[in-house]
């Protein structure tokens, strides 16, 4: 189930974004990027609609996914 990011408390959203970025592992890009920059990138993706907050009832967890991946997974389950 998609959770509208606008309805999440701002401090909670900040914590979710930071946890997501930290969980994603090492960035092997040419230039090292700060945690703040990475969090800002994920926030931009949420705001633009490229990414969505997804609640898993099965696992009782929340995750951030590319919008296209969420729809593909939802179609496979139907």
Curated annotation (Swiss-Prot):
Q: Which domain of life is it from?
A: Bacteria
What's the short name of a Pfam family annotated to this entry? Answer: UPF0270
Q: Which InterPro entries match?
A: UPF0270, YehU-like_sf
**Family of the protein in this entry:** Belongs to the UPF0270 family.
Report the protein name in the record: UPF0270 protein YpsIP31758_3941
